[in-house]
Structures are given as C-alpha cells and as structure tokens.
C-alpha cells in the first residue's frame, strides 16, 4: 500500500500583508501532478487545510477544486482532520455524504474509536481539540494538558484496536523535541502542549501535522509531513513537499519528496547601498525577501526603494543596532570627552560616518538650549 502524507496547507495564508494564494494554487497543481505519477492508495491530510477559521471564498474554492480532482476525478481516497487553524464546522460540512466517495473528513471526537479502514490498514484519527473540549468529551475536569488528553484518547482507541492489522494514528499535535517555526500558532495558551512519543507505541505508524519541518523529530515510526510551502522567514532552510509511506511485505518505509515552489522565501543580509546596487546575492528578484541591512539610518523610506528593485520585499530590519555582536571597547575614559565628541562617536558607530559641519552646529544649538533650560 502506498500512502501519501501531507499537512499544513494553510490555504488563504497572508504573510506580512501579501496573499500567498497564487503560490498555493501553483504548489497544489504540482502536488496533483505528482499524485498522477504516484498513484497512491490513499492521501492523508493531517490538519490545517486553511490558515484561519474563516477562510475567504478564494481559499475555499481552491480547496474544493483540489479535492474534486484528487477524490472525484482521480478516485483517490482522502482522510482529513482539522488542525488548530481550521473551523471544524466549516470543514465538516457534508462529511457523511462525502464518505460515499471515500473522502473521510474527521472533525468529530466521537469518531476517534471508529477507524477508517482501507485494505488491511486502520487509520485512527484524532482531530485537533482544545483542552476544554477534551474535558467535556471525557467528562473529566482533571485533564489539564495535551499529554493527559492524548492518554485518554489512546486508551479510548485501544478498546477497539485490531492488532492483526496495520494501525496508523493521524493527529495534529506537537511531539516533544520537535523543531518549531514562527508560523505555527501555539496549540494552547498557558499549558504544556507537547506530548511524549512513547505514548504511541501501540501504533505501527504515526502521521502528524502542525510542525512545518518535515524532519522535525528523529523517530523510526513518527512522521511530520511538513508544510507544502515556507510560511515564515524562519523556514527558509526547510525543505517542503510531502511524504510517501509504503507498506510492503509487513515492512513500512517512508521517504520525503520535495516540491519546487513558484517563489521561495529568502533572508538577505548586508549593507543598504549594496542591496540598492544589486551587489548582494539574491536567488531570484521575484522571491519573497526579508532584508536585514546596515547603514540605512540616513535613508528616507528604504522599503520603497528596495521594492522598486525587489517587488516582493516583505520585511526590512535595520541591523545597525546589532546587540548580539561583540562590542569593541576602546580604551577611552568617556568622562574626558566633550558632548559633541561623544555624539559624533555614537553617530559613527551607527552609520559609519561622522557628523557634518551642519549637523554639528544643529546639535550644538540643541545642547546649548538644553543647558540653558536646565539652569533655570
């Protein structure tokens, strides 16, 4: 059996004011093309299909078009759960009717002990739920962490698990030690959200969503597929794609398949003038860029100038104040320096230049006014 594991599509995502829908449509086209070659027996989407509980109509239409092609045109069974970004109600609409075409949308906690069976494989689904929802479902106020909730869920599943089959757990959660990214919204506020990987030992395989790095943890049987695209500048070095899990002769193997996006995210560091003169190394001008530049304090609206050359510049950081670098302490007694010299040294440390005669005169005028005000 060939299983495709994907998650964290985040359709409708907006990054620093820029809609990524065009990029998402492009990567889903690539995903569909790949599925035509892969011919999988089932596709598992482990949550966060949308980026928000209230996706716009274009995001909804993109998901519907993708699902129609994969499920109705290509007749591939789909198993989907909601993530912490999704609305259960919106995602679950018509789910019972969709099962007739082997599209299983699992957002109801009541279905956690009702596996989706495909061949000799049982898929146990755990949709994302808050601690309060878990307390209500199990009628137990003692559940205060995701680990405690997962313990109850796994015991609930264990009541019906068939050890003669291959049992796969599908969830949207954080395993301890997993690599985090800036674009991942915390599962909960005020409680520990990570869980111990040893809890899953009753399963042959665990397919997860939420963490965007496809190699978030080192495990022989727990997999994160990662997101289809880079969704924050902390993900620029992360590969993006999907995973293939194959079950053959009672052996389970997996491999990661990268997908090439329309645009990548890049972080570019250097001096402002080098950026404007196109001397800094940029893979492609159309990529989404975050510039971290020095020596631009004297520039009026540097973002505007950068966008004239790099139209998809999404972020700009002034690195002049870099407190992480070591500070060079000159052997000077600051008490012996006059005010103008101190200010000139400070200005030079920031801009790499010294005060002009006109700037010095203005500062002298301000200092005189301050001294006169202080003596009153």
UniProtKB/Swiss-Prot annotation:
GO terms for molecular function: 3'-5' exonuclease activity; endonuclease activity. Belongs to the SbcD family. Disulfide bonds: none annotated. CDD domains: MPP_Mre11_N (cd00840). The gene is sbcD. This is Nuclease SbcCD subunit D. SbcCD cleaves DNA hairpin structures. These structures can inhibit DNA replication and are intermediates in certain DNA recombination reactions. The complex acts as a 3'->5' double strand exonuclease that can open hairpins. It also has a 5' single-strand endonuclease activity. It comes from Staphylococcus saprophyticus subsp. saprophyticus (strain ATCC 15305 / DSM 20229 / NCIMB 8711 / NCTC 7292 / S-41). Keywords: DNA recombination, DNA replication, Endonuclease, Exonuclease, Hydrolase, Nuclease. It comes from the Bacteria. GO terms for biological process: DNA recombination; DNA replication.
């Amino acid at each position: 059996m060939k299983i495709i594991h994907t998650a964290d599509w985040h359709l409708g995502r907006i990054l620093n004011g820029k809609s990524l829908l065009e990029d998402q449509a492009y990567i889903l086209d690539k995903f569909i093309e790949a599925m035509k070659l892969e011919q999988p027996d089932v596709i598992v989407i482990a949550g966060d299909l949308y980026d928000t509980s209230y996706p716009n109509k274009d995001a909804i239409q993109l998901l519907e078009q993708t699902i129609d092609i994969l499920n109705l045109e290509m007749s591939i069974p789909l198993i989907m759960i909601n993530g912490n970004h999704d609305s259960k109600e919106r995602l679950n609409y018509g789910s019972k009717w969709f099962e007739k075409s082997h599209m299983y949308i699992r957002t109801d906690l009541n279905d956690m002990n009702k596996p989706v069976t495909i061949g000799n494989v049982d898929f146990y689904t755990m949709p994302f739920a808050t601690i309060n929802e878990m307390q209500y479902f199990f009628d137990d106020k003692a559940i205060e962490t995701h680990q405690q909730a997962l313990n109850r869920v796994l015991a609930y599943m264990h009541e019906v698990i068939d050890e003669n089959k291959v049992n796969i757990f599908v969830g949207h959660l954080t395993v301890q030690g997993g690599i985090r990214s800036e674009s991942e919204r915390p599962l909960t506020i005020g409680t520990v959200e990570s869980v111990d990987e040893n809890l899953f030992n009753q399963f042959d395989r665990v397919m997860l969503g939420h963490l965007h790095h496809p190699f978030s943890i080192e495990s022989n049987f727990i997999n994160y597929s990662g997101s289809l695209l880079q969704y924050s500048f902390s993900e620029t070095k992360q590969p993006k794609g999907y995973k293939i899990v194959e079950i053959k002769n009672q052996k389970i193997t997996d491999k990661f398949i990268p997908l090439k996006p329309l645009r990548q995210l890049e972080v570019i560091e250097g001096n402002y003038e080098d950026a404007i003169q196109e001397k800094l190394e940029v893979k492609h001008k159309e990529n989404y860029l975050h510039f971290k530049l020095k020596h631009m304090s004297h520039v009026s609206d540097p973002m505007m100038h950068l966008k004239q050359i790099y139209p998809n510049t999404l972020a700009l950081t002034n690195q002049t104040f870099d407190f992480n670098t070591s500070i060079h302490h000159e052997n000077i007694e600051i008490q012996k320096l006059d005010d103008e010299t101190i200010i000139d040294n400070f200005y030079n440390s920031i801009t790499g230049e010294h005060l002009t005669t006109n700037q010095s005169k203005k500062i002298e005028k301000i200092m005189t006014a301050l001294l006169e005000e202080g003596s009153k």
